[in-house]
Regions:
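Small-residue-rich hydrophobic transmembrane alpha-helices
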Residues: 1-42, 81-100, 207-271, 305-307
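Residue-level signature of transmembrane alpha-helical cores of multipass secondary-active transporters
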Residues: 34, 74, 100, 104, ...
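Short membrane-interface helical motifs at transmembrane helix boundaries
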Residues: 40-68, 72, 262-289
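Hydrophobic transmembrane alpha-helices of multi-pass small-molecule transporters
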Residues: 42, 111-116, 141-145, 217-220, ...
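Helix-terminus/linker motif at the lipid-water interface of multi-pass membrane proteins
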Residues: 53-61, 117-124, 184-217, 235, ...
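Alpha-helical transmembrane segments of multi-pass membrane proteins
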Residues: 61-84, 216, 282-305
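Membrane-interface helix-loop junctions in multi-pass transport and translocation proteins
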Residues: 108-142, 271-273, 286
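Interhelical loop/hinge segments that connect adjacent transmembrane helices in multipass membrane
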Residues: 133, 142-186
Length: 307
């Protein structure tokens, strides 16, 4: 995500300043960084799987096999996540918010549909949930790249621009590191929370996993507004129109909060049927509903943070 955000900021500013060569260089280098980073991250995840799941997270004995399977399958799709995020960032930077939004929504919807198919129809359990996520990410990565190739062929990565990897790579990392640190802190917090949830047993773990899926749907508006404002602000900053960027930011905050509150109300009204889509019942459903109902009262704060 941080690499995609970095290329979005860089390309948007270059686009606003009409620096065509810099646009090509940053795009080409960003894909190179994504491929290299995915190799190292995938290897690190495979090596860390056992100590993280069995040690730090202290997964219950009866769930360790499923936890390992989910983690390893999900880690195998890291390359698709990074490539999709880079392409997504390029589309956003170019001002194609509609195309970027469509692929974001398709990815989320496909993930939910495949979850239902793999879990409810084929009874694949958590392995099916992981496979659904990876397939959705792979489909989005391929489809978005083909879209980029068809609509904006000039924005495709080109080998002759890789010579600029030092300068553009340093810029992309400088833009990505703050977002990377924020994401890292959130991830550490998530791991600590997951460890605490694991201590309450299988019903809490199953309920929390289902709740996260519904939460992802509730977060789509804030992610969409983030898509719009980051590109809008980047292009205007590149064109030295700072007042316009500030007005856009304030308007986006207002719209994002209002829509997030509306979605929270809908989720609170239909929380039980939404959670039952993921085949949870009894105590797992009760705990998921309790967690989701509390979370929905504060989802608007996440919208402000994302924007």
């Amino acid at each position: 995500t941080s690499i995609g955000a970095g290329v979005n900021i860089a390309v948007a500013q270059y686009f606003g300043a009409k620096k065509e060569t810099d646009i090509q260089e940053s795009i080409s280098v960003s894909y190179l960084i994504a491929v290299i980073a995915s190799i190292f991250l995938t290897a690190a995840c495979f090596l860390a799987a056992r100590p993280v799941i069995f040690g730090f997270l202290q997964a219950p004995e009866e769930m360790r096999f499923d936890s390992m399977a989910y983690f390893l399958i999900y880690s195998g799709g890291i390359i698709f996540q990074l490539l999709y995020n880079v392409t997504y960032g390029i589309l956003r930077a170019h001002g194609d918010s509609r195309g970027a939004l469509i692929f974001l929504m398709i990815s989320a919807a496909l993930n939910i549909v495949l979850d239902c198919v793999f879990i409810s129809v084929f009874h694949m359990g958590v392995s099916g949930a992981a496979a659904a996520t990876v397939i959705a990410q792979a489909g989005s990565a391929i489809a978005s790249f083909l879209y980029l190739r068809h609509i904006f062929p000039d924005l495709l990565p080109k080998r002759r621009y890789l010579y600029a990897w030092k300068g553009q790579g340093a810029l992309l990392m400088r833009l990505s590191i703050p977002i990377m640190l924020q994401t890292g802190v959130n991830s550490i917090g998530f791991l600590i929370l997951q460890r605490l949830i694991n201590s309450f047993g299988a019903p809490s773990i199953e309920g929390y996993a289902a709740m996260l899926k519904v939460e992802q749907l509730a977060h789509i508006p804030s992610q969409s507004f983030n898509v719009a404002i980051s590109s809008f602000a980047g292009q205007n900053i590149g064109a030295e129109k700072l007042d316009r960027a500030r007005r856009g930011y304030r308007t986006t905050i207002l719209m994002g909060v209002l829509i997030s509150i509306s979605i929270s109300i809908v989720v609170l009204l239909f929380d039980r049927p939404l959670l039952q889509i993921f085949n949870i019942t009894g105590e797992s459903l009760r705990r998921a509903k309790e967690h989701l109902d509390i979370l929905m009262f504060f989802i608007w704060t996440s919208t402000i943070t994302n924007i």
